[in-house]
A protein has these predicted regions:
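Exposed, low-structure sequence patches enriched in small/polar residues
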Residues: 47, 132-383
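Outer-membrane beta-barrel channel domains
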Residues: 1-217, 248-256, 281, 292-295
Length: 383
């Protein structure tokens, strides 16, 4: 599954909310990181030749129009277009969004149409959802796919939130030329409960406590039961500025239909993992964080990871962030492409990152990010 990254480029983040849609888990038919992403010919970062965004309203309709073109758009670079129209009212909202992508190097075009709604029938109830259709045109043939997401939310007060949702993406839905979908071929229900405690006495060292609980039951569109997931997260914010968080997760026995890359289903047993993180308040020019996690991978292997972070604020408009995450596990399960089988590895890896954020003036920002990963793995057995 593709990793989702947030966009820090001001042009693609400012006044972008008109293009927000109703999908779950950051999924969207308009994912700005696609623009200027890896080129289709060599994987290098694409250069943006021009981009324009127009936002406004006409009578009861709010609209957003977007177009971007990469260098060499006639041969290699891609062209992106999006149009969003929204009719907002006090108790309801209706919207449509269309995206179109041209990828000349692959002789591919992608058209995606979406319709979303947001209805508040009462003070504590909310209905949100979205319907999508994708139409892909390539040299090898055309395809179209359908998808939907529908949720009901219950918000009895400012401390409790509940949500139940259903999604269905067929196996030919494809919005990833300009959007982001973690996967297609999925039918899933999702249940969540959120509770916040904020009414602590003024002399309490605790400012707030939050609890998040989630459960999902997924299957693919052939009816194959995938791994159910149950997660609980607890967070505590202190008046001093420190915070602590606890995460516990259980993935219940089921099939993985992606790990073998089209070579059949893989049945996995129950897996459990959890983590604890603590961040200190800012003292002088420094803030620190530490964390530990316990993970279960593969068929029966356990592992452990550590996290250490340090943030330096040399002055108000500049901060430097350093982090290091070593991890060790003994049953890292991956698909070996050349041998067309699963392999279990004992691995040790370290992830490091250095980030600099500088805000020289209002509406100006400079961000630099360097990240590296080292892996040392030893084969244990094949399947």
């Amino acid at each position: 599954i593709e990793v989702l990254f947030s966009d820090k480029r001001p042009f693609f983040t400012e006044n972008q909310s008109i293009f927000d849609d109703a999908l779950v888990k950051n999924e969207s038919v308009f994912y700005t990181r696609r623009i200027g992403g890896p080129r289709d010919d060599n994987g290098a970062a694409g250069d943006i030749e021009a981009a324009v965004k127009v936002i406004g309203s006409a009578g009861p309709v709010n609209y957003g129009l977007f177009a971007a073109r990469e260098d060499d758009a006639d041969e290699v670079g891609r062209s992106y277009y999006a149009g969003r129209f929204v009719i907002p009212r006090g108790k309801w909202l209706l919207g449509t969004q269309t995206t179109y992508t041209e990828r000349p190097f692959r002789n591919r075009t992608a058209l995606v149409n979406a319709f979303n709604y947001d209805i508040k029938p009462g003070e504590v109830w909310r209905l949100v959802g979205q319907f999508m259709r994708s139409d892909i045109d390539t040299d090898s043939g055309d395809s179209s796919g359908l998808g939907s997401f529908n949720a009901i939310q219950y918000l009895p007060n400012d401390r409790w939130q509940f949500e139940f949702s259903l999604l269905h993406y067929d196996d030919t839905l494809d919005v990833n030329d300009m959007g982001y979908l973690r996967r297609n071929d999925l039918a899933e229900w999702y249940l969540s409960a959120v509770h916040d405690w904020t009414d602590f006495p003024e002399d309490s060292r605790t400012a707030s406590v939050s609890m998040r609980a989630f459960a999902t039951r997924p299957s693919n569109t052939d009816g194959v039961r995938l791994m159910d997931n149950i997660s609980v997260m607890l967070g505590q914010n202190m008046r001093s500025g420190s915070d602590i968080s606890l995460r516990i997760n259980a993935s219940l026995a089921g099939y993985d239909d992606l790990i073998s890359r089209g070579h059949g289903l893989v049945y996995l047993k129950n897996r459990f993992n959890g983590g604890l993180t603590y961040s200190t308040p800012k003292r002088g020019a420094w803030r620190k964080s530490v964390g530990v996690e316990v993970i279960q991978e593969g068929y029966e292997g356990w592992g452990m990871g550590l996290q250490a972070g340090l943030t330096w604020y040399p002055y108000e408009k500049l901060n430097l962030d350093f982090s290091l995450q070593p991890r060790q596990s003994r049953d890292w399960l991956i698909w070996i492409v050349d041998e067309e089988r699963l392999g279990s590895y004992s691995r040790r890896n370290i992830t490091g990152r250095v980030t600099a954020n500088w805000f020289p003036a209002e509406r100006h920002e400079v961000r630099l990010n360097a990240q590296w990963l080292t892996i040392d793995a030893e084969g244990r057995q094949g399947y």
